[in-house]
């Protein structure tokens, strides 16, 4: 009997070690088009950063990308997308949080204000992640490729990416201008306030774009 019990305990310990060593940690990505999955790979060179993130990890890490084109922190919550992430989140998982591009837009279903509703949504993502035992990481926005001499007031990202704006050539500057304002500051402030890891994606992508130049 003792021999069988010892064998059973050894088996249980072996299974425990095996399941512990093969535990998969998930990185959930929530955000907008700059992180989202893209289709039509053959004809569309555009890639969201969330698409390529898996390539930086081994098979013990799973990247689950929930970022969607056109979403703000507000619409991501209101459409039930955040709840879907929470339902799948387990202790030890990470949530990479990046919004701002569409929070700037004037449309009421998207718009939030930095220092107010935008910050409140970021806090919600952080606090609810922690309540589930997850680890939140805040990012600010990827820069737009705006090589204009002045900040063009337009809520159409596609127009802002073009070299011609309303029929007039606008690239007459070699300086990449900021189009996000306080929306890139808010994630940093919330990260400091709540002691959350912060990734300055604005600076990282600004430096990359600047090194490549206008034609890059």
List the model feature ranges, each with a label.
Residues 3-24:
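Bacterial Sec-dependent signal peptides at the C-terminal "C-region" and cleavage site
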Residues 5-7, 12, 29-36, 53, ...:
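N-terminal, helix-rich and Lys/Arg-enriched segments in bacterial and organellar proteins
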Residues 14-16, 44, 110:
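Hydrophobic alpha-helical membrane context
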Residues 22-67, 83-91:
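Serine-esterase "nucleophile elbow" of acetyl-processing enzymes
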Residues 27-29, 33-39, 59, 66-76, ...:
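Cell-envelope and extracellular/periplasmic
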Residues 47, 76-79:
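Generic alpha-helical scaffold signal
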Residues 80-216:
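Alpha-helical cap/lid subdomain in secreted, periplasmic
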